[in-house]
């Protein structure tokens, strides 16, 4: 059991550096909400929907500073939640290592020294922003908003599953990394 834990890859968000791609006003227009009474709730739902979408596609929609840990590598590996804007550092067992960035989204790393242990990469993702992602987030926010009070103590969850059209929109962005 301990051996398996030592072999686990880990990813951590150090900070969120970007902004939401869907504004509260835009989501309210989409949902035809004219009052300001629910602005805070809708804002939180936008963040929740965006995070769900990011986890579904394994890509950052809003730019973030991340740290990725790999217990061992053959020298070539992919960074999760690309595209990558910049790499701050790569260390192996606490020592800086030289590397080459490969790929269209700067997500593939090749360590110049080959295989390495205890590799830690700190990097910044650039995020994604286009109308399809905005549409998926707005549809999901609308589902959350319309079902915000649909809870009952005798059922596990009354909220409808994620709308199929949201998944369909996101499938073209989906990375098979995680």
Label every model-predicted segment.
Residues 1-178:
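Divalent metal-cofactor coordination and adjacent catalytic microenvironments
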